[in-house]
Regions:
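N-terminal, polar/Ser/Thr-rich
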Residues: 15-42, 169, 480-481
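Hydrophobic helix-coil surface modules that form long, contiguous segments used
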Residues: 174-182, 190-345, 374
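A surface-exposed beta-strand-loop module
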Residues: 50, 87-163, 235-236, 560-578, ...
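Non-catalytic accessory/interaction domains
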Residues: 221, 349, 444, 457-604
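Glycine/proline-rich low-complexity spacer/linker segments in large multi-domain proteins
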Residues: 74-86, 146-200, 588-604
């Protein structure tokens, strides 16, 4: 596949949301004590919730994610009933003992000092308010809670296979999001998340031997040391309190281990990179090598999409694979270097999409994962010269279609029939949405669209239609048909060179749309004298044309092709004897499911 993405570097200034848009705001203050031997914790949470909606709210909901790690939970049942369970989960939850399960319970809850009743529904807490929250008003919800860190199975947990003591993600009572669609109260089965934008002030008290890293800026480095300060104040007792503040984020994650090495690196962009990894001689060299490469990735992503808006990013060894969070990622660390670099690149790329653009991941997992895969692949092309960086996404997509497992990308993340369909749709087909869009509107227009999208919708919760509208403005091409067919259906792209006939001084080419999804067609012509040309056939529904491909001087724009008509006839002003080859989509960016009928070779 040819590299068609040429980045036009520019400075991006984050804009404010459009008039009429609203979103809720939350401010968390938490003080938590962790028993590292029993893997239990207790805490207080003061939550200031501001209702910026036009609606009066009579109740609120919290997520209690750790309750999923109990036998017969919805996550457990779903994992044991799906045909292709995640190998990291399988039936492991069902086998957890009482001291291995996870739980997260509210013990008391008050609204502005008034005691509230509440009801736990597995991974959700339902809370009727004593005083309804009217539009524009704020209320303070004060909670005492307790939890137990589950045996490490998926993302969060204790004592991972690599020996990381605490991977603490989705560990606190997290207020559910309320937006123009209403409350988002999906039970947790191990898939995606959605959160309220806000500020976090978190104090974590635990064994002083443990090193802590994660979301937020440490407020007391001299008191804790451990790589945050050259000199550490002497403290009495067996514990330390770590005080973190994270402004304008929608989650808070952390990890801790007594054997963490903590390195820092000042990146060119003014961002401090933190790295936490086990003191394991087998991995230290790779983790040292990772640090300058992460700085290069950060610089590339900044120039490609827009500035990373925080002054810190942290890579932590932990969890069970790789997972993105606010200002940090948790990844497994005992990998080959290409794998360690690759997962770090992908998770860092999420910072622009999963975090700053903050898609509703449950509804639009393909934007969250797919856009990160796309940006990661751009980095592979530019930084490492891997011109085949996009190929795996196309291959995986074609395979899931061939296997008959594809489901529409509009499927809720929890509702896919198979993990294969979810994974391939979210990661691969989501990435192809953007790379194939370069075939439709041109690579420069795609990069321009992403930059404008980031500039206009940072720190909000944009939707697929928001991106479509940005891309239409950037390109001058109508794209409703593209968003509809690629994400809301399983219509496939399949075009065929049906016949090629000599017509004296001309050559007649009959093209056929075999699949259900219409596309513009680039028909490449290779002449026997070595010259090349492209006959560009716009799709009528585009109501516009993309610019000529870079490096192609002979670019002919033909009459557009109406989607409902399966046959299109083209006349080339050259006899067949002068033509060596005809090829649909010479760039390889169109995800045609059958490439065998895309090429005509003139053997005469």
């Amino acid at each position: 596949m040819k590299a068609l993405f040429f980045l036009l570097f520019c400075t991006v200034v984050l804009a404010q949301p459009k008039p009429g848009y609203w979103q809720q705001h939350v401010s968390y203050t938490m003080d938590v004590a962790i028993d590292v031997k029993a893997f239990r914790y207790t805490g207080t949470q003061d939550l200031i919730y501001t209702n910026k909606s036009p609606d009066t709210l009579k109740r609120v909901f919290y997520h209690l994610y750790f309750n999923a790690f109990q036998p017969n939970s919805e996550m457990d049942v779903r994992s044991r009933s799906i045909v292709d369970p995640d190998v990291r989960v399988g039936a492991r939850i069902e086998k957890l003992s009482t001291d291995e399960i996870g739980y997260l319970n509210a013990t008391t809850l008050h609204q502005d000092g008034v005691s509230l009743s509440f009801q736990e529904e597995e991974t959700l807490l339902v809370v009727p308010l004593a005083t309804p929250l009217v539009p524009g008003a704020s209320t303070t919800l004060t909670m005492r809670f307790e939890g137990q860190v589950p045996k490490q199975i998926r993302r969060s947990g204790r004592n991972s296979e690599e020996g990381v003591a605490l991977s603490m993600t989705q560990w606190y009572p997290k207020l559910a999001e309320y937006d123009h669609e209403g409350w988002h109260t999906n039970p947790y089965i191990g898939r995606e998340f959605h959160g309220v934008w806000g500020d976090f002030d978190v104090k974590l008290t635990l064994d002083k031997r443990y090193v802590v890293g994660g979301t937020g800026y440490l407020q007391n480095p001299a008191e804790v040391g451990h790589g945050y300060a050259e000199k550490m104040k002497k403290t009495k007792g067996k514990t330390l309190t770590w005080h973190f503040v994270a402004p304008n984020v929608h989650d808070f994650a952390w990890a801790a281990d007594p054997d963490y090495i903590h390195d820092t690196l000042e990146a060119d962009s003014g961002v401090t990179l933190h790295f936490f990894y086990k003191n394991n001689p087998k991995i230290i060299e790779n983790w040292k090598r990772l640090q300058p490469d992460t700085a290069k990735l950060l610089s590339f992503f900044n120039n490609a999409i827009g500035p990373y808006p925080y002054k810190q990013y942290t890579v932590l060894q932990g969890g069970d694979g790789g997972m993105e969070y606010a200002m940090c990622t948790l990844i497994t660390g005992e990998r080959t270097y290409p794998s360690l670099y690759g997962v770090t690149s992908h998770e860092l790329a999420h910072s622009w999409f999963q975090h700053v653009l903050a898609f509703n991941e449950s509804k639009y997992a393909w934007m969250d994962e797919g856009f990160a895969v796309f940006l990661d692949a751009l980095g592979e092309q530019s930084l490492n010269g891997n011109m085949a960086a996009f190929a795996p996404a196309y291959e995986d997509y074609r395979q899931v279609v061939a296997d008959g497992l594809e489901e529409p990308l509009t499927t809720h993340a929890d509702r896919f029939d198979t993990n294969t369909a979810y994974r391939t749709g979210s990661y691969d087909k989501g990435a192809v949405f953007l790379s194939q869009l370069a075939y439709v509107i041109g690579p420069e227009a795609v990069i321009k669209s992403l930059r404008l999208f980031y500039k206009e919708f940072a720190f909000t919760h944009p939707t697929p239609n928001d991106f479509k509208r940005i891309a239409e403005k950037a390109s001058g091409i109508q794209l409703e048909w593209y968003l509809n067919d690629w994400t809301r259906t399983t219509n496939v792209i399949d075009y065929n060179i049906k016949s090629v006939t000599n017509k004296g001084a001309q050559t007649e080419v009959v093209l056929e749309r075999v699949g259900g999804m219409g596309m513009p067609i680039d028909l490449g012509v290779l002449y026997k004298n070595g010259e090349q040309a492209v006959h560009y056939i716009p799709l009528q529904m585009m109501f516009g044309e993309k610019p000529p491909l870079a490096g192609i001087s002979n670019w002919a724009v033909e009459e557009d092709w109406a989607w409902a008509r399966p046959i299109y006839t083209l006349l080339i002003d050259a006899p067949l004897e002068e033509i060596s080859q005809l090829r649909i989509d010479p760039t390889g960016l169109m995800a045609d499911i059958d490439l065998s009928n895309n090429v005509f070779e003139n053997t005469k």
